[in-house]
Structures are given as C-alpha cells and as structure tokens.
C-alpha cells in the first residue's frame, strides 16, 4: 500500500506513554481487564460494561483533562496511522456529500499505550481499537497491529489500514444518524436482538472500509498487489466464529457482535467492488 503518498492528518493526538489520568477517579487497569474478559465471555461489548462501571464510580467525567501531543507522530507506525486517517478524510469529504448529501466532519484519532480515558469511559489495550461516538474519536493502541500479526497471522499495511478504516466507518455511520438509532433500539430489546443489531453495525463498517479503499485506489492508485488479500485475510481472522472457536472451543452465534468470518470478508469485498454507501446497507439486506 502506497501510504507514504497520503496526506497526514492534523486530527491526531498521541498519548502513548502517558498512562491513565485522574488516579483515584477512574477504574483501575485490573478492573478494566476483568470487565473486558467478562464481556468477551458473555458476548457483550466490553465498552458497555466499562462505560457503565465508569458512570457508577463517577470516573467518566475527567477524561477530557488528558491531553496528548498534537500533530503528526515521528515514528513510522504513528506516521502510518496519521497518513491513513488523512486519506480517509480526503475520501469521505468527497464521497459523503456526493452519495449522502452530508458534509463530512472528520473524527479525531487518539494513539495510546496500555490505557487511557475516552468519552465512552476507560480504554484499555485489551479492548482493541474502537470508536467512541460521544467524543467522535477513534482510539487505538498501535501494538494491536503486532498482535494481529502474532496472534492472527494477519499482517500487512493494508490489513492495518482496514482496521483504522473500519473504525472511521463507524464515524460515518454516526454522521448518517445510524449509531444513535441503533443504540436506542438496543436498549429496548433483548440481548440476542441487541447483538444482531451490533453485527449489522459492524458489517456495515467493514463495507464502508471497502468503500474508502475503492475510492482511495481510484484516485491515488494506493493499492499494490496482495493488498486486498491482506485485508480479506484480516477480516477472516477476526470473525466472531473463528475467535470463539479459538478461545472457547465452540461457536455461539447468538453472542456474535461483529459477524462471522464469511460475513466480514463478504461485506468488505462488497464495499471494495461497489464503492457505494448504499451497497453497505446491512439493515435492509436480506442476507447478512
């Protein structure tokens, strides 16, 4: 992937090495890890458990006090993340008005190590990358890319770019008004249906990542041989069925929150081929 040619984003905040702020006011790292593992075992998004615990302890109010370094990081992986974010900004600032008649407001990207605070509560490396709609920010510990390579054998710069573009896809969903409606609905239904709604949200973000890649390649010729295979392999490696099989030896479809390997590969490919937001409407699709 020719990411070196991308414009770097100014919407990056680097908190790596800073640790958690606020000391006694927030959840401890051990608590965050336990809640993350509990969410994984129960099929519940860990961010829901952590965010709830933050509100109960009064620890969610101080996250804005943490300020990291602004601007383009100097290390290679930091520059990579900044460049991919910049390219998503360039793509969506054109595609969203053209296809959805909405102006694109770019999200922020926070790089952290181990743990930090977000508008949605505590963020811990074990949770993986995530998007917080409350502060319209993507959070990622870049060591996740090393874990992708080590644990899932899913490395490569375009595979890593797909992960970032997926989280930006959630921001696009938020700008389209989809996330607030889904979250409201999830509070009204049972766990199985709430999980199914989560799967639709995640698969749409996979597809939107494909839409970004389609237009990035069309405009900048950014993809190189093998890149698409890298991303599809990554999508396969992080499917709920595959992860559950690895971690607990069995698959529980009702607890899926992101979609199966087959679904994630198929929706990413749909976005790559179509380049259209409309093609990513998982909420009206007869087949997920």
Where are these regions (language model features)?
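A Zn2+-metalloprotease active-site environment signal
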Residues: 6-17, 24, 28-257, 265-288
């Amino acid at each position: 992937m020719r990411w070196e040619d991308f414009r770097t984003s100014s919407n990056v905040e680097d908190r790596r090495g800073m640790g958690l702020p606020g000391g006694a006011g927030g959840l401890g790292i051990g608590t965050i890890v336990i809640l993350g593992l509990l969410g994984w075992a129960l099929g519940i998004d860990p961010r829901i458990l952590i965010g709830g615990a933050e509100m109960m302890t009064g620890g969610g109010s101080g996250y804005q006090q943490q300020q990291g370094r602004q601007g383009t990081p100097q290390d290679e992986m930091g520059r990579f993340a900044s460049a991919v974010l910049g390219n998503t900004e360039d793509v969506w600032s054109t595609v969203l008005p053209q296809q959805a008649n909405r102006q694109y407001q770019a999200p922020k990207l926070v790089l952290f190590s181990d743990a930090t605070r977000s508008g949605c509560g505590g963020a811990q490396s074990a949770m993986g990358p995530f998007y917080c709609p409350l502060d319209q920010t993507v959070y990622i510990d870049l060591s996740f890319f090393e874990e992708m390579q080590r644990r899932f054998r899913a490395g490569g710069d375009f595979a890593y770019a797909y992960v970032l573009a997926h989280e930006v896809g959630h921001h696009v969903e938020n700008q389209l008004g989809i996330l607030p409606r889904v979250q409201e609905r999830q509070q009204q239904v049972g766990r199985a249906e709430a999980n199914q709604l989560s799967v639709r949200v995640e698969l749409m973000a996979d597809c939107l990542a494909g839409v970004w890649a389609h237009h990035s390649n069309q405009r900048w010729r950014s993809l190189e041989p093998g890149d698409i295979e890298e991303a599809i392999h990554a999508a396969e490696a992080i499917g709920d069925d595959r992860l559950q099989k690895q971690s607990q030896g069995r698959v529980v479809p009702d607890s899926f929150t992101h979609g199966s390997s087959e679904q994630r590969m198929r929706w990413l490919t749909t976005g790559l081929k179509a380049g259209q937001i409309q093609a990513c409407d998982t909420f009206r699709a007869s087949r997920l």
